[in-house]
């Protein structure tokens, strides 16, 4: 046994140094693109310093040195059915479910294998929701309903909580830890990785795709070459198109003073203080004038005030009002996609339409613009 060990040691000394690979940022980015990502950026973990503990990814993997962000484009054509008012299934199915559940995890898996083959750990983090110790919607303590987990709430076997769990409870596993499952702000993490900026509508904007993408992340203890945060021409034009075309008036006016500001390692990120609960209701159910699946009579009747939020009877937008809306309207959507029932996309389509105009980051990307006629609105 001793001789074998010596022999092994000798052979290691004889290895050609050129055969030893060193994990690089380029290797990771090349692997990400080859696996199907559209863009990849890398940030040092130090950029997350100062984030609230319950949303700080540094707690996920304390030894991690690098955060790797991946962009997955939403094909503009996925929005075409809603833009024309003729097909509403493809957007939630492909742009939400397809990317978050299939395409992104596959890339995380492949890039993670590359990193671990080089001797470093790969902590993959796909999109999820309704798992943290604070609300996805307003950041308040405790779990609340989340559109990322909204699936057949009345028919699901575990409907006793918004989580689809029988009991909502979580606690730190050791002193100094945060309670599981820790979630962080994906869009700010993407900014940290140099992938883009936050627009007024709180959407992540990238120079290549405007608002048309989703993201996923990977954390590793490998020290890599890092990307600078975006510092080019502002991607958001502050044009107010997203404000005007939101059917629920969820986005404040540009000059309203209603803003959220975050200092991300010296970069100021600012967006409109969106009414997230109201947005939840309208982006999944669109409202009287933009949901062709719900009969006019249902809106008119507004039984038991279930649609007060959608009809403007109340300004109160919270979890209870959302549940009323879902209970009243979910049966009118023809089929589920195993994900939330996004039917709006008003802010995204408005943003694309403006960014495709002269001076926008999407100018010249397509032969023809997304919007070729006046946006539709039901007459009722």
Ranges and model annotations:
Residues 51, 97-356, 363-372:
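Catalytic cores of enzyme domains
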Residues 8, 12-111, 144:
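Non-catalytic, usually N-terminal nucleic-acid engagement modules in DNA/RNA processing proteins
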Residues 60-61, 143, 375-380:
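Short alpha-helix boundary/capping motifs
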Residues 4-6:
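Acidic, Ala/Val/Gly-enriched low-complexity intrinsically disordered segments
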Residues 79-83, 91-92, 358-380:
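C-terminal, charged low-complexity interaction regions
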């Amino acid at each position: 046994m001793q001789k074998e060990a010596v022999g092994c040691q000798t052979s290691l000394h004889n290895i050609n140094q050129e055969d030893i690979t060193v994990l690089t940022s380029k290797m990771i980015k090349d692997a990400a693109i080859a696996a199907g990502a559209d863009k990849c950026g890398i940030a040092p973990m130090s950029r997350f310093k100062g984030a609230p503990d319950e949303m700080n990814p540094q707690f996920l993997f304390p030894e991690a040195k690098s955060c790797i962000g991946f962009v997955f484009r939403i094909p503009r054509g996925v929005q075409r059915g809603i833009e024309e008012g003729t097909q509403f299934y493809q957007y939630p199915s492909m742009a939400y479910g397809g990317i978050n559940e299939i395409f992104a995890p596959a890339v995380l898996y492949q890039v993670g294998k590359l990193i671990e083959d080089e001797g470093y750990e790969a902590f993959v983090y796909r999109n999820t929701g309704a798992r943290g110790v604070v609300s996805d919607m307003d950041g308040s303590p405790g779990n609340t309903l989340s559109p990322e987990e909204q699936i057949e709430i009345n028919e699901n076997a575990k409907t006793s909580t918004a989580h689809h769990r029988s009991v909502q409870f979580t606690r730190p596993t050791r002193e100094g830890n945060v309670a599981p499952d820790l979630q962080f702000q994906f869009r700010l993490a993407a900014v940290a990785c140099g992938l883009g900026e936050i627009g007024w509508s709180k959407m992540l904007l990238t120079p290549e795709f405007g608002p048309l993408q989703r993201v996923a992340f990977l954390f590793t203890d490998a020290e890599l070459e890092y990307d600078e945060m975006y510092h080019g021409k502002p991607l958001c034009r502050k044009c107010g198109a997203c404000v005007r075309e939101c059917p629920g008036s969820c986005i404040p006016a540009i000059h309203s003073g209603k803003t959220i500001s975050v200092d991300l390692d010296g970069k100021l990120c600012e967006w409109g203080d969106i009414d997230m609960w109201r947005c939840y209701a309208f982006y999944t159910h669109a409202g009287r004038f933009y949901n062709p699946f719900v009969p006019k009579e249902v809106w008119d009747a507004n039984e038991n005030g279930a649609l007060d939020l959608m009809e403007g009877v109340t300004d109160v937008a919270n979890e209870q009002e959302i549940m009323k809306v879902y209970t009243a309207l979910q049966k009118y959507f023809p089929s589920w996609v195993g994900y939330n029932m996004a039917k709006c996309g008003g802010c995204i389509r408005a943003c694309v339409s403006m960014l495709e105009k002269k001076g926008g980051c999407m100018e010249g990307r397509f032969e023809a613009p997304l919007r070729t006629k006046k946006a539709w609105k039901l007459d009722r």
